[in-house]
């Protein structure tokens, strides 16, 4: 009875992982597109200036990190669909690689989002001690697009943190005796044979 409920739970976990990876692809790609293509041109004191993501280094890093994370999550989504249909999801090297890359991806996206948020707060409220003026009063549309991009990347980072928990669960189940028997038919035969 317990084996049938465990077997029935696995497709639900795989389905949840697929949905979450798909959501992370969409959120990270949306963040990269919003940040990468946001630009606004204004004339201030007879000088025409265009605000783009490259003007704030942290926004540019977030744009690149979100684009890379979207590509990685898409590759993992394809791997998840392929491995669940072929039954090769129990490979130890694949589990370790997925675990480490999922963790790294979540950390990089979260850290770059936090850095971009901190840098953009200067543009939002200014710093009078350093005589940095508020820029979001001038470049309103650019700031709104940057805020939407950072919100999408924060949601993607939260989803990636949950996905790293899925990867950790899959990896550490390979080290449990019950999980090892399910993923390795030879071990199941050796465990049931008399010594």
Curated annotation (Swiss-Prot):
What compartments host this protein?
Cell membrane
Q: Which residues form a coiled coil?
A: none
Keywords attached to this Swiss-Prot or TrEMBL record, sorted alphabetically, are: Cell membrane, Membrane, Transmembrane, Transmembrane helix
Transmembrane segment boundaries: 19-39, 58-78, 107-127, 146-166
* Topological domains annotated Extracellular: 40-57, 128-145
Topological domains on the Cytoplasmic side lie at: 1-18, 79-106, 167-195
Q: Which domain of life is it from?
A: Eukaryota
Protein's membrane topology: Multi-pass membrane protein
Q: Which Pfam families match?
A: CASP_dom (PF04535)
- InterPro entries the UniProt entry points to: CASP/CASPL, CASP_dom
What GO cellular-component annotations does this UniProt entry give? plasma membrane
- This protein's major location comes to membrane
Question: Subunit composition?
Answer: Homodimer and heterodimers.
Family listed: Belongs to the Casparian strip membrane proteins (CASP) family.
UniProt-recorded name of the protein: CASP-like protein 2C2
